[in-house]
Each structure stands twice: as C-alpha cells, then as structure tokens.
Amino acid sequence: MTARLTIRGVRLIDGIADEARANVDVTVEDGRIAAIGAASEVPPPDGTTIIDGAGQTLLPGLIDCHSHYPIDTTVDDGFESFRHDPDTLIALRAAGAARRALESGVTTSRSAGSPGAFDYVLRDAITAGFVQGPRILAAGPAMTITGGHGWPFGREADSVVDFVRGVRANVRDGAEVIKAVASEAAMLSGWDQGAGGAEMTEDELRAVVDEAARLHRRVLAHAQGGEAVRRAARAGVASVEHAFLASEADLEVLKASGATLVPTLSVTDVWRTIEGLTPVSRSRQDYIEPLHRRSCETAIRMGIPIATGTDCGVRGVTSDMVAREVRLIHEHGAPAMTAIRGATSIAARTLGLEEEIGTVETGKRADLLLVDGDPLSDLRRLERVRVVVKGGAVVHRVAAA
C-alpha cells in the first residue's frame, strides 16, 4: 500500500526562498515530497494521513555536520570514557544520543569520528530499524598523526603513504566520510596561549583529500589554529571544523577554497556557564571564547558559508543542540534565514547531499520538521518541535498542549 501524508496549512521555509510561504500544503508519497502548493491546488488522495499545520512552520529536517554520539558528555574529556566504559555502555549511549537528536528535528548527522566500529554499528542499527536516530554519515576513526589529537581512538599515520593507507582502510570498514585532524584541540590538550597548533602537514592533508575523492568520499578537517585552517583549506577539504583561533587572513584562504566553515559554536557557548570545569578547562574557555566569537563573526561578514555542527560529545554539548547552533549563528551576525539554511540547504551541500535533502522540493527525500509558530521571528521556536518526518515516516510527534 502506498504511504501518503499531507501536512496542511503550514508556513513553509523551504531552504531556498528568502521568504517563508504562508498557507501551504505539502504532500509526501513513498518517502518523497510529491506535491507543494495551496490546499486548492493539492487535493490529498484518498487514504492520506492528514496533519493540521495551522499556526506552525514546516522546514527541511535539520542536519548536524559534526557529531560524536558515542562520547560521554558529562566529563571534561569524553574520549577518556572509551578507556574504561564497556562497549555495551558506549553503544547504548550512542543510541540514546541518536534518538535525542532525532526528536529535536535532526534527520541527518555527519559523524566527526569515533573509535572502532561504533559509527558503523549505530548507522546500520538505525537503517535496520533496531534503534531510532538520524540518517548517519559514518566517519569511523579520525586520521591523525602519531600522538596527535584523538590518537588513542584515531587511526595514526606519519607519512603521505600511511595516510593514504588509512583512508583506504576506513572506506573498507564502512566510512562514508573521512575526518582529518589538522590541529591540536585547544580546549582539551596540554596547551599554552599558542594552542591549536597545526599537526598534519599540507601534503598529508592533500593526500587524504585526493584519496578520499578517488573513493568518492569527502573530508572534514578539525582545524582550530590559523595555520591548520590554511593548510586544510588549500588541501581541498569540504569543510573546516571549529577555526576557533583563525584570523581574517586565515579566513581569506578558507573563503578562496570554497569550503564550508562548521564553527561548532555550542562548545564555547555551553562552557561559558557550565559548572564543574577544572581550573585549567575554565582558563582555556576564557581565553578561547572571545577569539572563537571574533573568528565566526568575521567569517559571516566575509560571506563564508556556515553550516551547523554541534560537536556533541564535548562536555555539556548534547545531540539536540542543532537548533541552538542555528540561533548562535544568527547571534554572530547571520540573518535568521541564512542561519536556518546553515542547518538545511548549506549543510546538505557541504555533505554532497543537496540533490536528496536540505530543501523542501518535489522529488526530494521527505525529511521534514514541523515547529510551533514562526522561527524567523524567534529562532528559539525551532526547539518547539511538533512533528519530525524522516524518509516520509512520522518518527516523532508531540501532542498539542
């Protein structure tokens, strides 16, 4: 039997137009968007499930371009949890984070690296319907230099040949994207005020990008300091993650490359007020946060494409914070509609999935989010989720109060 769904009378933010459209019906059939228009133009077929969208806004499902679902968010360095937590607990934690993300409106998530097979197992379990969560683009272990950021749970390499071999191994194991660690992690590693230093060489980064492209994969690069941002951008990565300490000159190189910036603003935003940080962590936060703000504001002013990525797995940063990330992008200078596109059409283009998701258009995969009110007047309304549709199926619904 053909599965049909019509969401009636909504305000539509389609991820393309500069303005929302009022009083629109969107019909879904067999997992795809079949029709969009006024009610008189789109009569629903017999047997259609109807959702009344009056007073609500329909958007494309949200996209998280930087997630770590298996990591413990309750400790300063969640990577340490992999040293002592049993695999069963890690897997259950990942499943819980995935469900939390889905219920907040996230329908696609790009992993930014996890140890072993956790990414692949979670992705496959969601695809099989064993657990609920967003569609996951799995990265597997991040590519890093020996002793570099994330080394205990990454794939270490020390030459162009080693990095090429690592990309091939990750793809063999099931990776759909490749994570390259181009710099230190200023918030986590031992550091001074020169934190965020470059780790992978530009030749190594270029080798990763070239081999990934040969295998039809894209590369995201953890790059916090300016030199790492420049190296990653020149190497041809699809996106630069964080850029906490990047200057305008560094960002000029990023802009020229055409790569997207995924600033992960929730990290320093959450840490501004979180309790229980160690004195060292508080010192890192106090130093990095204003520089991070300046970097993102500069990137927005320069017109660099910005996409949402929570970096969930960092202490206090949870998988339901994509809507928060949209709001933070707006607060750093982007118009509200542009910030929403950062979680929809810009994010989809960053992942290379713009033909499938990221906009509400006929023929696209029916990943949809219905929220109360008008988020363009208050982006906090993105957190007032009413219905989440993934692949044409209603996967989460909140009854009206």
What are these regions (language model features)?
Residues 214, 289-371:
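His/Asp/Glu-enriched, well-ordered alpha-helical/loop segment
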Residues 73-76, 119, 188-190, 229-235, ...:
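Histidine/acidic-residue-rich catalytic or RNA/ligand-binding cores of hydrolases
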Residues 343, 349, 362-401:
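C-terminal cap of metal-dependent C-N hydrolases
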Residues 68-90, 99, 132, 140, ...:
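Active-site gating loops and adjacent loop-to-helix segments of metal-dependent hydrolytic enzymes
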Residues 155-235, 239:
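Metal-dependent enolase-superfamily TIM-barrel catalytic cores that perform enediolate-based chemistry
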Residues 93-119, 132-144, 175-189, 218, ...:
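Divalent metal-dependent hydrolysis catalytic cores, especially in the metallo-beta-lactamase
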Residues 56-130, 149, 203, 235:
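Metal-associated gating/positioning segment near the N- to mid-region
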Residues 2-5, 12-59, 80-81:
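Histidine-rich, glycine-flanked metal-binding segment
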